[in-house]
Amino acid sequence: IAEQKIKTTIAHSFAQKYGPFDSTSLTNYVEPYLDSSNYNRSLKNNSNKPQCNDLIKHFTKILTDNTKYPPFKHYQTKHGHIPIWVFINKLTFGEMRKMFEVLKIQQNISNVFNLTPSELRSTLIYLNNVRNDCAHGANFFQQTYPALKSSIKIISDFETTFSFQNSSIGNLFTCLCL
C-alpha cells in the first residue's frame, strides 16, 4: 500500500511539474523522466558525474528491455510514448527511492505526506530495507532495525495509536502495515 501511494504521488507530482507529454511532435521527443534537466545534477556518483545520469541510463534500459510489457506496448503503440504513471509501476522500490533522491521536486512530494524531504528520504530508506528483508526471507526477530525518529509523522502517529513506541517489533509492524 505504501509503495503504491509513494509511486502514485511521485508520478502525479512529476507529471504536474513536467507534463505527461512535453512535445508537440514525436520527432525529437524525450520522455520527461529521461530528461536530466528535471533532476538535481549537483548530486554526484563515485566517478564525480551526476547521479541522475546513472538513473536515466538505467531507466532507458528498463524501457528497452520491456518493449513487450503490455502497458508499455499499449502506450507506445496508441500514444507514441510511455507516461510517467505507467513507467513508474515497473520500478522496484529501490529504483523509486533512488529516483526520489535526485528529483528537483522532493518538496512537492514530501508535502503530500506532511514530511520534509529529509524525513521522507529516511522513511523510504527504512521501508526499502524492511521490504528487502521481507522479500528475501530474512528472519525479522534476528534483524536489528533502527528506531525511526519520532518526528516522522507517518510512523509516530501510528505507533502512538497502537502503543508501539521505542519497540523494534513495533517499528517493523508499523512498516508492514504501511
Describe every region a protein language model picked out:
Residues 1-178:
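Long, contiguous internal "core" modules enriched in hydrophobic/ aromatic residues
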